[in-house]
């Protein structure tokens, strides 16, 4: 099996077709999730006043909705786009309430189960059409991604080194890929992580795409050659390995880690609220059942602890931190936890501006960019702010496609255009790092 997806590559490695068949046909690879989303809806609302916002907050609490955006009920305010996943039974109550109060709404997804099953059907079809090579235009399970990592580690020794920095709560290895020409004892580095929130599948898809493009174009693209010769990229394709696996086997829209709380039945911590920077302040929840639960203490999650330890150890050489999320079409930089201007604002803002301009040049997709607190919302305890506060001067968070039409169910047909445009943005940021700011 060709793990670079290019039959002309001389360094490609092949595995028996039966290996891929087993991975496609094994339980959990394409899952109906026990019909758990039958009749569920995704509804968009934009409150036109603070009174409407307060009314929505109250009923969201009562109905225990799953907010797709924003990530917390506390963020619901006048003019804020609110995408709500709600069960079939609760949707009747919500729709009756909206009609009674004359709050405008739009149903984005009429039957979530059908949307999920359609996603799974397309996955199976696309995988079967490409048994001869690793397909970068489909979503892959954790097992597939780990096999991909190990194979590139064996077949690309001049550019790739894969290693583990620890284990997850459920005991899974936390794999990192070091990507770059092994030419110097000391090189500056860029950190890239994807999949800190389990349901955001486009993130891990981009991490894989980035690696493929870097390896395939290293000898032909002067910019890529310069990047890999002068920098190491530390890439974590799946940050939240337990949650990502769970999103493939049990709950497609799971967000958090899978750790247990001794006092509550609810599981998991928001891995992007668990960092030691204004921990559990605004935009985070202290309740274990909330999607933005900050955890019992900073770095309580072994996944967060392992990455924080690695970044601390290498912070003198790591000059950029890039984290990939979905969805909103934004490029964000610090601060998230406060309304303030970072000291190197002009340099970071220029890099962000050039990146979104480059991104837009590919398919015309518009991204907003700016400080996270002003562009998205105030949130505390996140990885981007932590990286910046710990001496990494370029810290960015991408919110990839789309803006809500598909939400977390971004179709596989949009993986390639999303990754192609994002690739250009990342190259722009990296080249700016090499040319401009220290």
From Swiss-Prot:
Cofactor comment: Binds 1 zinc ion per subunit.
UniProt cross-references to PROSITE patterns, sorted A to Z: CARBOXYPEPT_ZN_2 (PS00133), PEPTIDASE_M14 (PS52035)
InterPro entries reported in the protein's UniProt record: M14A-like_propep, M14A_act_pep, Peptidase_M14
Propeptide span(s): 31-129
Record organism: Mus musculus (Mouse)
Residues annotated as catalytic: 399
Annotated residues for binding of substrate: 197-200, 255, 272-273, 326-327, 377
Primary subcellular site in the record, as a coarse category: secreted
EC numbers: 3.4.17.-
BP term (GO), one: proteolysis
Source organism superkingdom: Eukaryota
Cofactor: Zn(2+)
Purpose of the protein: May be involved in the proteolytic inactivation of enkephalins and neurotensin in some brain areas. May convert inactive angiotensin I into the biologically active angiotensin II. Releases a C-terminal amino acid, with preference for large hydrophobic C-terminal amino acids and shows only very weak activity toward small amino acids and histidine.
Keywords: Carboxypeptidase, Cleavage on pair of basic residues, Disulfide bond, Extracellular matrix, Glycoprotein, Hydrolase, Metal-binding, Metalloprotease, Protease, Secreted, Signal, Zinc, Zymogen
A Pfam family reported for this protein in Swiss-Prot or TrEMBL: Peptidase_M14
Residues the record marks as carrying a glycan: 89, 153, 344, 428
GO cellular component, one term: extracellular region
Identification of the protein by name: Carboxypeptidase A6
Keyword set includes Zinc: yes
Signal peptide: 1-30
């Amino acid at each position: 099996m060709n793990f670079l997806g290019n039959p002309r590559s001389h360094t490609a490695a092949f595995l028996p077709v039966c290996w891929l068949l087993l991975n496609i046909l094994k339980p959990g690879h394409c899952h109906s999730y026990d019909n758990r989303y039958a009749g569920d809806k995704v509804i968009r609302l934009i409150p036109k006043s603070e009174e409407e916002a307060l009314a929505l907050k109250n009923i969201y609490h009562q109905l225990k909705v799953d907010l797709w955006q924003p990530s917390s009920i506390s963020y619901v305010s006048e003019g804020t786009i609110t995408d709500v996943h709600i069960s079939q039974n609760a949707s009747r109550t919500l729709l009756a309430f909206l009609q009674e109060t004359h709050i405008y709404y739009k149903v984005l997804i009429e039957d979530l189960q059908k949307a999920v099953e359609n996603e799974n059907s397309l996955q199976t079809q696309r995988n079967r059409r490409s048994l001869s090579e690793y397909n970068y235009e489909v979503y892959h399970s954790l097992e597939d991604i780990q096999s991909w990592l190990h194979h590139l580690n064996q077949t690309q020794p001049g550019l790739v080194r894969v290693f583990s920095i620890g284990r997850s709560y459920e005991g899974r290895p936390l794999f990192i890929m070091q990507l770059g020409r092994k030419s110097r004892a000391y090189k500056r580095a860029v950190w890239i992580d994807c999949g800190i929130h389990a349901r955001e599948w486009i993130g891990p898809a981009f991490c894989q795409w980035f690696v493929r493009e870097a390896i395939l174009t290293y000898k032909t693209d002067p910019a890529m050659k310069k990047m890999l010769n002068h920098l190491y990229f530390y890439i974590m394709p799946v940050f939240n390995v337990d949650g990502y696996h769970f999103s493939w086997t049990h709950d497609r829209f799971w967000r958090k880690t899978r750790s247990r709380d001794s006092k509550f039945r609810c599981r998991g911590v928001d891995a992007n609220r668990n960092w030691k920077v204004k921990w559990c302040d605004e935009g985070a929840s202290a309740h274990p059942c909330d999607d933005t639960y900050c955890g019992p203490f900073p770095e309580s999650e072994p996944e967060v602890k392992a990455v924080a330890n690695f970044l601390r150890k290498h912070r003198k050489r790591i000059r950029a931190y890039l984290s990939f999320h979905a969805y909103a079409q934004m490029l964000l930089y610090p601060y998230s936890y406060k309304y303030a201007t970072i000291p190197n604002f002009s340099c970071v803002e220029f890099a962000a501006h050039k990146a979104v301009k480059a991104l837009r040049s590919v398919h015309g997709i518009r991204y907003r960019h700016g400080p996270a607190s002003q562009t998205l919302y105030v949130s505390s305890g996140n990885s981007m702010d932590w990286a910046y506060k710990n001496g990494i001067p370029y810290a960015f968070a991408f919110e990839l496609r789309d803006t809500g039409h598909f939400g977390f169910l971004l179709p596989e047909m949009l993986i390639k255009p999303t990754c192609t445009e994002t690739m250009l943005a990342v190259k722009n940021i990296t080249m700016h790092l090499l040319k401009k700011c220290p």
